[in-house]
A protein has these predicted regions:
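Short, charge/polar-rich alpha-helical segments
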Residues: 13-36
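Short, compositionally biased low-complexity segments
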Residues: 3-10, 34-43
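Short intrinsically disordered terminal tails
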Residues: 1-10, 23, 95-96, 106-112
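Acidic, low-complexity, intrinsically disordered interaction modules
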Residues: 37-40, 44-111
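Intrinsically disordered, low-complexity coil/linker segments enriched for acidic/polar
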Residues: 3, 21-22, 52-55
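Residue-level signal for well-ordered alpha-helical segments
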Residues: 9-12, 16-19, 43, 52
Length: 112
């Protein structure tokens, strides 16, 4: 799924929760997509050649930042995926929407 579409969907859900204004929701959605894409790139590097210590720290920092943005936006993290063939981050959206083969229990994926 294209990043713009993911951003639009996430932004709409963040606004529907009611904790953020539409502008803040759009900023949160853009940041989440950017961070998740960076995390996915590190997953690709890990699969191909392994991560250096610096890259491991970066990965941990990205996961921490993603959790912080999700908390501020009122969204719930389902899980992080280390497999570069799928989405890097899976969320539990309020209405149970999903976009992966894992179904509702896997959640809505971003970061590809």
């Amino acid at each position: 799924m294209r990043t713009n579409t993911q951003e639009a969907v996430l932004s709409a859900y963040i606004v529907s929760i009611g904790k953020r204004t539409p502008r803040e929701a759009a900023q949160d959605a853009a940041e989440l997509c950017r961070l998740a894409t960076s995390l996915n790139r590190l997953n690709e590097i890990a699969c191909n050649s392994g991560l250096t210590e610096r890259q491991e720290r970066r990965k941990q920092n990205l996961q921490t930042r993603i959790k912080a943005v999700l908390e501020g936006a009122g969204l719930v993290l389902n899980h992080f995926n280390n497999d570069p063939r799928g989405y890097a981050v899976y969320l539990d959206l309020p209405d149970g929407t999903y976009n992966s083969f894992g179904g509702r229990e896997c959640g809505y994926g971003i970061g590809r």
